[in-house]
Amino acid sequence: ATPRFVDIDLTTYLIDSDKIEKVINTNTRCILPVHLYGQCAEMDKIHRIADAHNLYVVEDCAQAHGATYNIQKAGSFGHASAFSFYPTKVLGTYGDGGIVITNKEQLKDRLNRLRSYGMDDTSSAQEHGYNSRLDEIHAAILRKKLTRLEDYIYSRQTIAGRYRDALADSNIIQPYVSANCTHVYYLYVCR
């Protein structure tokens, strides 16, 4: 596939959903919104566009563990959603790792093959694949840390509040939080 880039909304730094349809053509297969810096993209608009053009939605949730849009969690909107567990992420382990989630059976089967050298349950390679399995130690760390995800988010939101207060009287443009979103502040990006 050839990516077609869509500019950002300068207020939120997220994909400008009003510009998506301008880049859709007959070769377009999916829309890949990035939930950047800890805030979700406008998923209702994105889904309306995807439905109108019969496109898949694949969410990039690498920076948005626990973020919400209209009370719904990041990663629950798309046909597939990817999360990073790099150590600096809101939910990170002590090395590289990630996960792709889906409720589409056929896609799940393909993803399982791709992460395991292209092999299926019979240990027969069906296609080119990778060694992308999360090892047991990192899975155990994540399982334990997952129980504290809300605490990590609260801590980040508290620190963001301190930044907001400290910078309130400056000319610095601080992060905008959409009214229908919960921001988890993976980064506190200012201009």
Predicted segments with their positions:
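Structural loop-to-beta junction motif characteristic of Rossmann-like glycosyltransferase folds
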Residues: 1-2, 55
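Short beta-strand->loop structural element characteristic of the AMP-binding/adenylate-forming
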Residues: 2-12
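Structural motif
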Residues: 3, 80, 97, 185-187
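PLP-dependent aminotransferase class I/II
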Residues: 7, 16-18, 22, 30-34, ...
